[in-house]
Every structure is written in C-alpha cells, then in structure tokens.
Amino acid sequence: MLHKLLIVVFLVVCLHDMRLNGQKKKETLLSEKVSQMMEWVSKRAVVRLNGEKFKRLVRAHPRNYSVIVMFTALQPQRQCGVCRQADEEYQILANSWRYSSAFTNRIFFAMVDFDEGSDVFQMLNMNSAPTFINFPAKGKPKRADTYELQVRGFAAEQLARWVADRTDVHIRVIRPPNYAGPLMLGLLLAFIGSLAYLRRNNLEFLFNKNVWAFSALCFVLIMTSGQMWNHIRGPPYAHKNPNTGQVSYIHGSSQAQFVAETHIVLLFNAAVTIGMVLLHEAATSGLDIVKRKIMCVAGIGLVVLFFSWLLSVFRAKYHGYPYSFLFG
C-alpha cells in the first residue's frame, strides 16, 4: 500500500514539474517574441514580415499582443497605385503610434508584401491588395477584423478608428507638416491682389453677375459630385482587379465611391447644366432662328444623353432601382 502511495506521489510531483517547465518555456518564448517585435519597431514603425516571420510571430502561440497587418504589393511590376497610397497612410498611422506617449507592446503594425510572402497570401486565400487584418491577442480574426477598405477608404484617421474599435487602443494621428495648402492659398491671394491692383481703376468685373453665377455653379458642381466625401474618407482613385486586370471606376456599393467616380459624376452634371443653359438661351436670346434651332438640338442632346448616363450610374450603385432612360 505504501509502495503504491509513493508511486502516486512521485507521478504527481513529476506532472507538476512538467507543467511548471512548460509554463516557464511558454513565458520565455513569449518574452522572446515581444522583445523581437520591440527591437524591430525601434528601428521601423511598420515591421516587414515574410512567410516564416508571419507564422512565428503572428499565427503561432503564445501571443499576448495584437498585430495589424497590411497585405500589399508595392513592387513596381505589380502596378498597384492604390497600394502605394495606402502604404503612405499606414506609415503615418504606425509612426503616430510609435512616437505616442501611450505607446505599449499591446499592439504592433506589420506588413506582408506579396513578393516577400506569397505563401502567406496563399495560406489566407487572399487575392486582392491592399488588405488590412487585425490578428487579436486571443482567438482567431473575425469578420470585423478585416478592414472594409472600399467603404471606409485608407485615410490614416479612418484606420485609427477601426483599430480603436477592434483593439481598444486609441491613436491620435499626427501627420507630417504639409506646406502645399498654405502655399497655394498664398499664391491665390497674391494673384487676386495683383489682379485687383492692375485693374484698380476698373473693378466692374467684381460686380458682374455672370462671374459670380459661374463661380457659384462651379462650387455647386464640385460639392454635389462628392468631393467632400473624398476629402474626409480618402478613397482610392479606382480599383484594379488583381486577377483579371480590369479597372473599375464606379464602386458597386451605395455606401462608397472612387475618386474617378466623383469626376465622372461632375462631368455628367456639368454637361446636363450646359444643356439646360443652351435650351434657355435658345428660347430667350435674340439670335437668328437657325442658330437658335442648333442650340436647342444641342441642348436636348446633352440633357438626354448625359442624364441617361447619370441614371445608369445611379442604377449601378443602387441595385433594384427601377427607372432608366436610354441606357438600361
């Protein structure tokens, strides 16, 4: 009986020691991973990962830190202009966190380039870039851990809000100073001042209703085309399918848009406006009948053609919209 009791005690002690050794080994491994990440971050805010580093530092356990990973294709032969723009915003976000007083090892920013880690793209069944995914400290990434690039855009401020939602880490985005805006404003004011000085004896153009009407019309066209949304969200200019190479200029969702789409809508609205002006002039001007007929036909053509295209764009974004004109 005593012999059996000693065997049981011996087994319990051995299992306890094995558990302690396993725990110590786990803690040592975790400490090494965190130290490695901190060392890399001290040199560069965004850690570049290949397949082996991604598996060891992001996928493998133990891990008590979250990793935001941007999957991209920055090599020139990939011809991904959006990737370069997204990378600039991502670098701004990562540097804002790196040099923040609240910086900790709770979260790291990393990047996997297709040409350096194509096996990672295959592992995750990923066929588009850029893509942002949050790998949480515990558990696997959920659907909300994949950033909705087409909806939110890739502005650093939008990425920071998403990071705060997924990790509860709030980052104040600090952009490097950009002197282009103040410089352009200064040049514009100098131009206006010079023009006013040169024509100081004849300032009737400031009271010309056509000048103010044209200026107001340009402002309305710019605002109704979605330029302010672009300024806030920072969407890509267009989207190129990496598999087919086809470029999309119109976003298929009513919740987002491309910059090119804004230019297209602005052009269509401007053409419809010109058509309406021609129709008005054809009916009220004192020109001869032939010129008025030409203006009338041109105005009708512009309104019908471009309003039809405008409706087709609307139908492409709002699926199920029942109305169309010339184009289905």
Swiss-Prot record:
Gene3D superfamilies: Glutaredoxin. Its main location: membrane. Residues 23-177, 224-257, 315-328 are extracellular. Disruption phenotype: Early developmental arrest. The keyword Endoplasmic reticulum applies. Pathway: Protein modification; protein glycosylation. Residues 1-22 form the signal peptide. It comes from the Eukaryota. Pfam families: OST3_OST6. Glycans are attached at residue 64. It is found in: Cell membrane; Endoplasmic reticulum; Endoplasmic reticulum membrane. The chain crosses the membrane at residues 178-198, 203-223, 258-278, 294-314. GO terms for biological process: magnesium ion transport; protein N-linked glycosylation via asparagine. Disulfide bonds join 80-83. It is a multi-pass membrane protein. Residues 199-202, 279-293 are cytoplasmic. Residues 40-168 form the Thioredoxin domain. SUPFAM superfamilies: Thioredoxin-like (SSF52833). InterPro entries: OligosaccharylTrfase_OST3/OST6 (IPR021149), Thioredoxin-like_sf (IPR036249). GO terms for cellular component: oligosaccharyltransferase complex; plasma membrane. Keywords: Cell membrane, Disulfide bond, Endoplasmic reticulum, Glycoprotein, Magnesium, Membrane, Signal, Transmembrane, Transmembrane helix, Transport. Accessory component of the STT3B-containing form of the oligosaccharyltransferase (OST) complex. Accessory component of the STT3B-containing form of the N-oligosaccharyl transferase (OST) complex which catalyzes the transfer of a high mannose oligosaccharide from a lipid-linked oligosaccharide donor to an asparagine residue within an Asn-X-Ser/Thr consensus motif in nascent polypeptide chains. Involved in N-glycosylation of STT3B-dependent substrates. Specifically required for the glycosylation of a subset of acceptor sites that are near cysteine residues; in this function seems to act redundantly with TUSC3. Belongs to the OST3/OST6 family. This is Dolichyl-diphosphooligosaccharide--protein glycosyltransferase subunit MAGT1. It comes from Danio rerio. The lineage of its organism: Eukaryota, Metazoa, Chordata, Craniata, Vertebrata.
